[in-house]
Amino acid sequence: MNPIFETYFTRFEAFEQQSQKPVDRNLGIIVTIPCYHEPDILQTLNCLWNCTMPSCHIEVIIVVNHSETADNSIKQFNQKTFEQLCEYSSAKSTGTISFLPLAAFNISKKQAGVGYARKLAMDEAVHRFAQIDNPEGVIVSCDADTIVDKNYFIEIETFYRNNPQCSAANIYFEHPLTGDLQQGQYQAIAQYELYLRYYVEQLKRIGFPYAFHTIGSCFSVRAKTYCRQGGMNKRQAGEDFYFLQKLFPAECFGEINITTVHPSSRQSDRVPFGTGTAIAELKQSRQELMTYSTESFNILQDFFVRSKSLQNASEQEIRDTYESLHPCLKKFLPSSDFEQKIIEIQHNTKTHEQFCKRFFRWFNGLQVYKFLNFSCGNGFQKIPIGTAAKELFDKTDMDIFSLLQFYRLRAKKENKE
């Protein structure tokens, strides 16, 4: 067995192998899908089955899961779903794509959730690649209510073949804005996606080096990289955010934007937060989604500029820099923490590039998010997403849908450059 697989299985809390199904020697991409009380899973699988196939073999691992405390109706629904998936696998698996349903039923209440199911699926993908000694194999994270473009597999394969230095990548996404749902629901999802894109654009503007989306249905990672970073966590929600925050500073991260993933626009209560929950809350409140003001981001921008100049600074210069920071940031970040961390970074780096990289490993995406929330209670109120998105690029004449289209086009253009 390749040492990187062996290390992962022995050092980290990896799940044991679930399936004894033979592995195709040409296996190159594995799509992993958590599935909980999901009525549209066959629509997602049919979409994957209808994609143009790449040169490598494809596997799709679906983990049907529920907690030991789930309602009997959900348990019965999931049991029926699993049986349907087994029948689907027998009928639809071919020489180019195969489906592998797994059942994770009656998980302990403490562990049950999408993180558990996603980790089980991704760990199984590692076991599959380990059997054919393919550490370069690509694990794709998807969701059970997601649709993808026909060139999905082709573009994933092409990206990793043409970018051997890249260890992981996001896949461009757009939520559906038309269809059979109520107009209010599409209004809500447009606000939510605009919120996500506004946030990333602000991160880019202020010089944060890891300005990427963190969406569970839209990322991919090489098997060796997944292992190197300790694998997925079992969080009941937000598992994608925390996993990707580990990847961004440690690996070469790219973006695949020639194909598109279409996450569901429906409301849901399956996880404590996320797309479905946000849509439900917006519909119920009938208010505009609120976001962080440009002023809050500007405080971070100034902080980053000042901190990046401290590679060779004396202790007094570090203290002086701290005193020059915005009062809100100083309230968030105690002087002793800042000084100790900068000195530690100085002692462990030799070049400015190393200094900056280590600095942003410390003040990472989670720290940014925490500060922005902190600032909202300390003088910087949130503002409506429509107002914020208009002000950032001076687009005062646009409605929510036009703004979202502008931000989408901008994201695609930036990713190409």
Describe the function of each predicted region.
Residues 123, 133-137, 141-159:
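Acidic donor-binding/catalytic loop of UDP-sugar-dependent glycosyltransferases
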Residues 235, 247-262:
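Catalytic donor-sugar/metal-binding loop of nucleotide-sugar-dependent glycosyltransferases
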Residues 200-220:
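A recurrent flexible, glycine/aromatic-enriched loop bordering the glycosyltransferase active site
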Residues 150-189:
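Conserved donor NDP-sugar-binding/catalytic core segment of glycosyltransferases
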Residues 71-136:
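Active-site-proximal specificity loops/subdomain of glycosyltransferases
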Residues 235-242:
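Acidic donor-binding loop at a coil-to-helix junction in glycosyltransferase catalytic cores
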Residues 25, 46-59, 66-70, 77, ...:
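Short, acidic, metal-binding catalytic loop of nucleotide-sugar glycosyltransferases
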Residues 1, 280-417:
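Terminal low-complexity segments of carbohydrate-biosynthetic enzymes
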